[in-house]
């Protein structure tokens, strides 16, 4: 859409009542975000259940903390980088086919991990899983830009990210319950049942995606013409004043030449750093306080996720109302950095340790909700995909290095103290980079209603 056409959409949008616009977006959110929420819960169960399975995998497959995390992240990361570019094809083949393919493959591969018997099979399974899952996260972020203008994006992204919290809240007790009650059922070990029962639903959900999702508002049969017009006008008004890129061959290169893309990549890298502690080490940290019952560990592991979910909703709402991103991101990150630095000094107290994990969860969920609302605010439609892809790919450095480093440090020193302190410092540095290097006037967002 041209700049003139986008500008013409603004008065059309203003002629409609605030209540009518909100009603349309509630309808869109109920339809799309319910499905995406459940899909992401199933996706993130894989990250939660591996933290509970690691005790059994180390025993049955003969791997140390360092070996388990280094090899797993190495093969996962390499194929993730290959597959991460696939989400750009979402614009060509559509969200329905893309999400269907990703979910069916990851569900089947995740369930197949129940039948691995050697470390090599574990590495292969994780590599294939990384390739299958690649593109889901950035693809969904891009998909949301087809439906929601910038002023709504942090809040709607936070609802999407609530699925991660839900996966932690559900996954901990569920994994603990399966590991407790499925010991030697039908001749299979408890961790085998966990992978099967938590993997296959994703494949089923993938098939459902083909029949349930549509690629863009124009194709939605569940919207009438006026509702479609409201959404399209809101998106057009959001694009008003942005410089269009007409040469698609150079659109991605234009995004990669923007130094703010690399600053945001550094900021995004801090999020998986926090996620490493929360998603992979929470059960271990809780067990180290003296709590050994796997079901109790699972129940207590939900506390940080609950706190993080509540904080994310409040942070995202505040950010959207004020149309301010940088400070919200920084203070979210700083809170988690403090929690990571304090955690090594309170390992004997379950209550204080869980409090520190909750602080990290606030950082993890709050920062993730904010940072993905920044790129679309200053990148036009054609370069947004390139910018989001670059940020996601470069930010995976944090996701790649953190588990390896923590695993190695824990194996060598017998403690997570040094690793947690280093992560706290890196997280704070990433937050400061976004706050200082991204100009506030670069985030050209406009409120679309009087909210």
UniProtKB/Swiss-Prot annotation:
Membrane topology: Multi-pass membrane protein
One GO CC annotation: plasma membrane
Disulfide links within the chain: none
Gene Ontology BP terms: phthalate catabolic process
Xref: Pfam families: MFS_1
Molecular-function GO terms, alphabetical: transmembrane transporter activity
Record keyword Lipoprotein present: no
Spans traversing the lipid bilayer: 119-137, 170-188, 191-213, 260-278, 331-342, 354-377, 386-408, 416-439
Pathway in which the depicted protein is active: Xenobiotic degradation; phthalate degradation
Localisation: Cell membrane
UniProt cross-references to SUPFAM superfamilies, sorted A to Z: MFS general substrate transporter
Domain of life: Bacteria
Keywords for the protein's UniProt record, in alphabetical order: Aromatic hydrocarbons catabolism, Cell membrane, Membrane, Plasmid, Transmembrane, Transmembrane helix, Transport
Family: Belongs to the major facilitator superfamily. Phthalate permease family.
Protein name in UniProt: Phthalate transporter
Source species: Pseudomonas putida
